[in-house]
C-alpha cells in the first residue's frame, strides 16, 4: 500500500502551525469561559453587603461617605458587567487580535492583576472575616481573579509577541 505525500501541518511536521492552531482553540473556549466568569463574580459581589454587615457598619459613616461607597460599588459592578458583556460580544475580535480588542484585553488583564496585588499586598489576612465560608470564598474568588488575569494577559502576549504575523 502506497501513501501519497501530503503537505498538511501534520504531515509536514509544522509544529509551530499546529501549536498556534491549538492555542487559538484554547483561547476560543477560554474567552467564552472568562466572559461568563464575570457574571459569576457578580453573584458573589451581590452577597457582600449582607454577608459583611454593611447595613450596620455603614451607619457609622457620614451620609456623603456612605453614598460614595455605594456609588463606587455600583461602578465596580458596572465595570464587571461591561467586561463580561464585551468579552462575549467581541469574542471574534479578541481571537483575531483586533487592535481595540487587544487594548481592552490588556486593560482587563491589568485590572484583574491589580485586584490580586491589592488583595495580596494591601489587605492583611486579619482584615478578612473569619469562618470557613469566608476562607473558601476568598480562595475561590482569588483563583477566579487569577484565571481572568492570566487569560487576558495571555491572550495579549500571544497576539503581540508570540503569534506568527502578530
Residue ranges and their predicted role:
Residues 46, 120, 148-151:
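Polytopic transmembrane helical bundles with strong interfacial aromatic enrichment
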Amino acid at each position: 500500500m502506497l501513501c501519497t505525500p501530503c503537505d498538511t501541518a501534520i504531515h509536514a511536521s509544522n509544529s509551530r502551525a499546529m501549536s498556534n492552531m491549538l492555542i487559538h482553540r484554547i483561547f476560543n473556549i477560554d474567552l467564552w469561559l472568562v466572559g461568563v466568569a464575570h457574571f459569576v463574580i457578580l453573584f458573589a459581589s451581590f452577597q457582600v453587603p449582607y454577608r459583611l454587615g454593611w447595613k450596620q457598619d455603614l451607619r457609622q459613616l457620614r451620609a456623603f461617605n456612605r453614598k460614595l461607597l455605594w456609588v463606587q460599588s455600583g461602578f465596580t459592578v458596572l465595570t464587571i458587567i461591561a467586561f463580561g458583556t464585551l468579552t462575549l460580544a467581541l469574542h471574534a475580535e479578541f481571537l483575531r487580535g483586533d487592535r481595540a480588542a487587544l487594548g481592552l484585553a490588556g486593560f482587563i488583564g491589568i485590572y484583574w492583576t491589580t485586584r490580586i496585588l491589592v488583595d495580596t499586598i494591601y489587605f492583611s489576612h486579619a482584615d478578612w472575616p473569619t469562618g470557613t465560608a469566608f476562607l473558601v470564598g476568598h480562595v475561590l474568588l482569588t483563583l477566579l481573579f487569577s484565571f481572568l488575569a492570566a487569560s487576558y494577559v495571555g491572550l495579549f502576549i500571544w497576539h503581540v509577541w508570540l503569534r506568527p504575523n502578530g
